[in-house]
From Swiss-Prot:
GO terms for biological process: methylation. The gene is ubiG. One of its GO terms (molecular function) is 3-demethylubiquinol 3-O-methyltransferase activity. Its EC number is 2.1.1.222, 2.1.1.64. It comes from Cereibacter sphaeroides (strain ATCC 17025 / ATH 2.4.3) (Rhodobacter sphaeroides). This is Ubiquinone biosynthesis O-methyltransferase. S-adenosyl-L-methionine binds at residues 39, 70, 91, 134.
Amino acid sequence: MSATSTIDPAEVAKFEAMAAEWWNPHGKFKPLHQMNPCRLDYITEQIAAEFDRDLSAPLPFQGLRLLDIGCGGGLLSEPMARLGADVVGADAAPRNIPVARLHAEQSGLTIDYRNTTAEDLAAAGERFDVVLNMEVVEHVADPLAYLTACRELLKPGGLMVCSTLNRNPKSFAMAIVGAEWIMRWLPKGTHDWSKFITPDELYDLIRKAGLDPVDRKGMVFNPVSWSWSLSDRDLSVNYVTASVRPR
């Protein structure tokens, strides 16, 4: 029996319609491809710090079980597998899973991709050292229930990395007007600005879910270099957080 779900069917349908585009760096997921190096820098730094891993080692994350929730086509799952993690990629959109499986197979990677939800994984007793929760929380129907399921998925002392979009006039101008309406990097309607979450709101939700926030940084786009970088101060549009489940 399926656990109570926070999945928003309309949000899932948006990403199902774009499933074949995941590994096209010039397609509908171009913004994620551009952002990915910045996301990976933050994720790897946080995992290395939390679990005392040497990133110069051949497989620094060997022995860590990692869940990439809302994995899409595997843009984060694959780099984590290359670093040695035992990766489960989960997505509520059924069409994303065969795309992710095929690309992993072509890349010579072993990744356990599943069409499932955080709630169902938690109900099944699955537990992980790391949960990646990237650009998902703004698409769910009940953020607190969803984050609570993510906490249940973590082993004591486990790490959750969560990224999302701030809610303010600047984020509307850049993420909605700029990215969807003008530049057409994403189809119109990909994001619902009213579902964006401020950093303080997210910290409050994370604490209510039973996790301890330990870090947050902005992810800032430079339109001149067309690259992303981490910022300690600018969380005005995209930002990322790290939280741990108490031991």
